[in-house]
Swiss-Prot record:
The encoding gene: klp-20
Name the UniProt record assigns to this protein: Kinesin-like protein klp-20
Key words, A-Z: ATP-binding, Cell projection, Cilium, Coiled coil, Cytoplasm, Cytoskeleton, Microtubule, Motor protein, Nucleotide-binding
SUPFAM superfamilies given in the database record: P-loop containing nucleoside triphosphate hydrolases (SSF52540)
Cysteine disulfide links: none
Annotated family: Belongs to the TRAFAC class myosin-kinesin ATPase superfamily. Kinesin family. Kinesin II subfamily.
Native source species: Caenorhabditis elegans
Amino acid sequence: MEGAEKVKVVVRCRPISTTEKLQGHKIAVTCNDEEKAVNIKSLSQEDPPRTFYFDAVFSPNTDQMTVYNVAARPIVENVLKGYNGTIFAYGQTGTGKTFTMAGDLEPVEMRGIIPNSFAHIFDHIAKCQHDTTFLVRVSYLEIYNEEIRDLLSKDHNGNLEIKERPDVGVYVRNLSNPTVENASKMQALMEFGSKNRKVGATAMNLESSRSHAMFTVTIESCRNGLVTQGKLQLVDLAGSERQSKTGAQGERLKEAAKINLSLSTLGNVISSLVDGKSTHIPYRNSKLTRLLQDSLGGNSKTVMIANVGPATYNYDETLSTLRYANRAKNIQNVAKINEDPKDAQLRKFQLEIEALRKILDEENPGDDENQEEAWEAKMQEREVEMEKKRKILEERVNSAVNDEETHRLVKEMMENEAELKKARSEHEKLRSKLEKIEKKLIVGGENLLEKVEEQAKLLEVNNKELEQSKFQEAHLRTQLEERTAVKVEIEERYSSLQEEAFVKSKKIKKVSNELKDARAELKDLEEDHQRQVEAMLDDIRQLRKELLLNIAIIDEYIPVEHVELIEKYVSWSEEHGDWQLKAIAYTGNNMRASAPPAKKEFSNNNQTVPMYYSYRADLGASTAEHRPRTSSKKHRASIRLQQLLT
């Protein structure tokens, strides 16, 4: 595939917690940052240790700045050039995904990838030339129980729809997308949205995220008439969890089922993309994968941060996370710079500014710098002239001159004053509108860092130290490889048959160990598959309960003929991921709104409403006594459902 590049995958291991130490759990995961390797060891002697290699590995003592500069900085740099970029944190619940993405606000060194990206973006803008104009917009959403919610909206519990257009791609309809002028405003919006996000306590995490969150930064830039648009998606996924460990019940259990289902779909998408033989990628099976469609196998530069815990009692979940991460390394994306995109707002604002300036120029031609002063001077001249006329008029009135000329002058004076007031008001509106739009656009070279200047400096210093250490590491690695090559050459020179036999024995032992590892790998895959099947069965049992409850409610409260009517006129929409009603304009509520009020058909002292009154009034339904409990169609459907569920 031309221009394709693989998804970058990094692994971060959190420190072992005090609770885990008190419970006697040991460390099962060791990280080698230099070799970019993660080693996981089981308590069972039968299972050999596993080693996985990634694009970068962060041990428990790695600081937030290093994580940002290694994993996130290259993505943000590309977004500023006009590419799409995605950074998402994946892993078991309680492994530090939210800390990696958001971190703590204070001290500055503890901030995560999202706030650090704010400082990076505006530091870049401040260093650009004055001939480059920027427009920065943000959005913040969560996917809670398969419902998309706008975290920046006052009504953050509303369910939004996913739409798709050929010129724009996948987007969320009616999602708030405010413009920002500095990093402080971005930080304030992130904090506001984070407060609206769904969190809850479980046995594994007191502040467990109960939803997937997606913070998106859209950066448009214009230089020499060319508009580019980069989109940065920062995703904090909810963690996979087992009910036996989290102790989730009731609402928490329902949330966990939805989270596991969407993460299972994400795993299926990754598997299908890596397989290469799959003709269908199941993006539409969940709203999460639908929104990540470009990030996985599409037009985006993507980094996956796999978060793991070090304790032995999380061995199975950690191994599963590492397997998914190892598989994701083979996903290929084809990223391209977005030039003159259809949904760019920067061009629209520039045209609006030109139109407003043209109107202001017509009012008072001249240079932009002196235009406002000249207009104000002109207004003052008119006011002085009017003041002179007012004095003359007052003298005429005081001298008791009350002829037609005086009335004409009074009328003219009032019209001039109204005209002057209107001109000043319209000018102020135009000027205010122009300033408001210009404020949204950011000119390169302006210092917009404000309070985050210290943060930007820390990132820059850390990045320079990182580059220097990489250079030294590369130099040392070259020396090590040279010495290793010499050593291998010496070892391969057999001085006797005994040495040759010794080397052959080593090779046999190596192959034997590889065979042992392969068998253990197969065993782990079988166990992992069994765990996935058990998790799916748990989800099916939970969904079965909800389904039976809904069926019981329908049987008890909705007449059968109306159920059949509903079934006849509904169809499943793959695009919306929901049931759609045909001819919705002719449904009861819409028709009732335009119909005259219905006559009252009953009268009793206690004002109770008979059961199914609304159905009889609107559609002439049969009474409960003469209505059969079930129809043949529904009866057959119930039998099929019972067979499926049992």
